[in-house]
């Protein structure tokens, strides 16, 4: 089947979204073609403004449109505990559980030799400084239950072992190979409540 060039380009771009295959991209493209022009302009401007305005928090690495994010307000959070995640989206997944009230630290990924991502590519030194400066008592490691997530968790445990802090990890009720982004709130809430020493 031969689509017009501009439609083909739109389908190709939509396929870049995670979990969107060719058929879904086709459906989205045809749906967008039926949108009124003002909705398309609004979508385009919203995407551009979001990309322009949203940045990483200077403290924790989460997403914000201010210098420091909501999650770093020590007057609103338990400042003795810090939850370490790989990506900002993980912070929002955990927040949806309403089970955690501490601070966060986003590493910016996990260790991955296949992608040439070593410890120097992650925000580990910043984490260590924050633990000292804030006199953190507990670090909760909330990384995906994958080989890379497990390797990163073990690395963090070794790096932080000298500090006099409790290190815990989300309970292993999470399915192996799962991504926090796809775990339902109930499962994530139980995993947070049942976290264990690590």
Curated annotation (Swiss-Prot):
Origin: domain of life: Bacteria
CDD domains: TOPRIM_recR
Keyword terms: DNA damage, DNA recombination, DNA repair, Metal-binding, Zinc, Zinc-finger
GO MF entries: DNA binding; zinc ion binding
Zinc finger boundaries on the chain: C4-type: 57-72
Pfam families in alphabetical order: RecR_C (PF21175), RecR_HhH (PF21176), Toprim_4 (PF13662)
Domain Toprim per the UniProt entry, residue ranges: 80-175
GO biological process: DNA recombination; DNA repair
InterPro entries xrefs: DNA_Rcmb_RecR, Rcmb_RecR, Rcmb_RecR_Znf, TOPRIM_dom, TOPRIM_RecR
Known role: May play a role in DNA repair. It seems to be involved in an RecBC-independent recombinational process of DNA repair. It may act with RecF and RecO.
Family: Belongs to the RecR family.
PANTHER family xref list: RECOMBINATION PROTEIN RECR (PTHR30446:SF0)
Name of the molecule in the record: Recombination protein RecR
Name of the gene this protein is made from: recR
């Amino acid at each position: 089947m031969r689509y017009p060039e501009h439609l083909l380009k739109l389908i190709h771009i939509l396929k870049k979204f995670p979990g969107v295959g060719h058929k879904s991209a086709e459906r989205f493209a045809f749906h967008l073609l039926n949108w009124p022009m003002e909705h398309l302009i609004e979508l385009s401007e919203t995407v551009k403004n979001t990309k322009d305005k949203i940045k990483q928090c200077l403290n924790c690495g989460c997403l914000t449109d201010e210098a420091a994010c909501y999650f770093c307000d020590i007057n609103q959070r338990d400042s003795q505990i810090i939850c370490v995640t790989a990506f900002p989206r993980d912070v929002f997944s955990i927040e949806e559980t309403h089970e955690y009230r501490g601070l966060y630290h986003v590493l910016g990924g996990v260790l991955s030799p296949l992608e040439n991502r070593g410890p120097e590519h992650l925000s580990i030194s910043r984490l260590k400084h924050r633990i000292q400066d804030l006199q953190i008592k507990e670090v909760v490691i909330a990384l995906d239950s994958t080989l890379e997530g497990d390797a990163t968790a073990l690395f963090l445990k070794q790096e932080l072992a000298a500090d006099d802090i409790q290190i815990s990890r989300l309970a292993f009720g999470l399915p192996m190979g799962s991504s926090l982004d796809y775990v339902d709130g109930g499962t994530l809430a139980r995993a947070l409540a049942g976290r264990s020493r690590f």
